[in-house]
A protein has these predicted regions:
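A short, exposed helix-loop element centered on a Lys and neighboring polar residues
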Residues: 112-113, 154
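Short C-terminal tail/terminal secondary-structure segment
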Residues: 2-5, 222-253
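Conserved glycine-rich cofactor-binding loop
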Residues: 13, 20-21
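Substrate-binding pocket helix/loop in short-chain dehydrogenase/reductase
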Residues: 88-89, 96-98, 191
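C-terminal helical subdomain
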Residues: 169, 190-221, 228-230, 253
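Catalytic loop of short-chain dehydrogenase/reductase
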Residues: 126-148, 153-162, 174
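Alpha-helical segment proximal to the catalytic Tyr-Lys
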Residues: 117, 158-162, 219
Length: 253
């Protein structure tokens, strides 16, 4: 339980997408502990989580109407929802490519378009990218979607800055969640070999940063991109990961 009258985000209304489990649930819980009134959403809602398909413009419009009627304004948006497909360049189908773009890139764009008009000066938007957005990571649909999200974030920071609204991007590396649980052991081992800290991350490595970026303590930070990846993108060594995932690749010595 949280006390919404105290804490760093007391009195703030914050929307979190993809909040039914994993990283999104951890972010929502951390924001609530900081005093925010959290509107948790997910395409597969559970409990108090509200249903929201981030790729649906009508869903976003409906949420915006509800928020305006209930609160008048909101103060934060965490675009956390995302999906992954692991097909390589020559394998991916255009329909699957488009689906990933719809959730990972168009979803945050729609969220900003519909909810930023409800935000007063001092509000903050956090887009959850990926270390894939800083490299040539092999799953082409996922990587392209996160690179595109970087562009959306930069433009939003520029255009919303004069209104006093900040937009920043967090780039998680290999974080232990349901999404990464579906990865193969070969992928996990290859990724950890390229991670200087030598371990995977947890949702608790991400959530505190999201809280900080929504707080007044970060009031002069906008347009920033912050990797939380154990150093994976410090050297850009994703080719070995890509090579490890090839079915015709020789075993590492």
């Amino acid at each position: 339980m949280s006390d919404q009258h105290t804490g760093r985000l007391a009195g703030k209304v914050v929307v979190v997408t993809g909040a039914a489990g994993g990283q999104g649930a951890a972010e929502a819980a951390a924001l609530a502990r900081a005093g925010a009134r959290v509107i948790a959403t997910d395409v597969r809602p559970e409990g108090d989580v509200r249903r929201l398909d981030v790729s649906s413009e009508s869903d976003w419009a409906g949420l915006a109407t509800e928020l305006k009627e209930s609160y008048g304004e909101i103060h934060g948006l965490v675009n956390n929802a995302g999906i992954i497909r692991r097909e390589r360049l020559g394998e991916v189908l255009t329909a699957d490519f488009a689906q990933v773009q719809a959730v990972n890139t168009i979803g945050p764009l729609l969220g900003i378009q519909h909810l930023a008009p409800l935000m007063p000066p001092g509000s903050s938007i956090v887009n959850v990218g990926s270390s894939a957005a800083l490299t040539g990571y092999y799953p082409v649909a996922y990587t392209a979607s996160k690179w595109a999200l970087r562009g959306v974030s930069k433009i939003a920071a520029m255009e919303l800055g004069p209104r006093g609204i900040r937009v920043n991007t967090v780039h998680p590396g290999y974080i232990e969640t349901g999404m990464t649980a579906a990865a193969t052991p070969a992928f996990r081992d290859a990724t950890l070999r390229e991670t200087p800290l030598g371990r995977s991350g947890s949702v608790d490595d991400i959530a505190p940063l999201v809280v900080f970026l929504l707080c007044d303590e970060s009031s002069f930070i906008t347009g920033a991109e912050i990797p939380v990846d154990g150093g994976l993108t410090a050297h850009g060594g994703v080719k070995s990961i890509s090579d490890a995932m090839r079915t015709d690749a020789p075993a590492p010595e």
